[in-house]
Amino acid sequence: MWFKNLLTYRLTQEVPFEPEALEAALASKPARPCASQELTTYGFVAPFGKGEDAPLVHVSGEYLLIAARKEERILPSSVVNDAVKEKVEEIETEQMRKVYKKERDQIKDEIIQAFLPRAFIRRSMIFAAIAPRLGVILVNSASAKRAEDLLSTLREVMGSLPVRPATVKVAPVATMTDWVKSQQAAEGFHVLDECELRDTAEDGGIVRCKRQDLTGEEIQLHLSTGKVVTQLALAWQDKLSFILDDKMVIKRLKFEELLQEQAEQDGGDEAAQQFDASFQLMMMTFAEFLPVLFEALGGEEIPQGV
């Protein structure tokens, strides 16, 4: 269990995440298939294992892991629009009258309902790790919308979930731009060979650099003309590499081989033990990494009450 993306959410109040109570709460909204006339369903699933006996909360030391699954019927808009157009033309030709918006919308709804049972189904899972002592929920996603879907559903079953995205005191753009300009990142961090530069002017240009020396004259020239760094590839110690963006999203997160080998040694041969060992080691790494990252970005803005 290694996260590939990371969104960090800060609990603004202390929440007693008791595993048994959380298990019962998640069980009140299990994932289920879409009914024939449903566009989408959303609910919780076991993060590891299958079957009714698989727990919805994976407990590893002080850390908890949960997962949710979204199931949705895929109706291509072009297919629906073509069917609506064909039906409207048929009515206007046969009845010699114009079809206006209200009737067109009704036709569209009827066509969607007729097509739904035959639509393809797409399933997607999302994981979240809860670290009560650290006061954070970590979501394995680069999409704020997907993360908010999970958190709002968790809030629904728990009754309350005081949480907000983690923020820092200095805009990440300013810090990343300074690191590339000065050719020196904060202690423990190393700038790699990929970045995105944007012009600060409205509708300004975008430059994406890959496998490029970011200390070179070309990059410095872009920065001197007013562009800023909005995404930056970084490495931390000998443990992690990742892309950091201007919204504090961590993407393409990669745990270095030494960590993965350690998890394999700790986990042994059983799949369940391997899963638990990698999750535990990942969370211990995050517990060390996130405070250092926040400090490097100017310090975390801690909400009142925390």
From Swiss-Prot:
GO terms for molecular function: double-stranded DNA binding. One of its GO terms (biological process) is regulation of DNA recombination. GO terms for cellular component: bacterial nucleoid; cytoplasm. It is found in: Cytoplasm, Nucleoid. The keyword Nucleotide-binding does not apply. It comes from the Bacteria. Keywords: Cytoplasm, DNA recombination. May be involved in recombination. Belongs to the RdgC family. HAMAP family: RdgC. This is Recombination-associated protein RdgC. It comes from Pseudomonas putida (strain GB-1). The lineage of its organism: Bacteria, Pseudomonadati, Pseudomonadota, Gammaproteobacteria, Pseudomonadales.
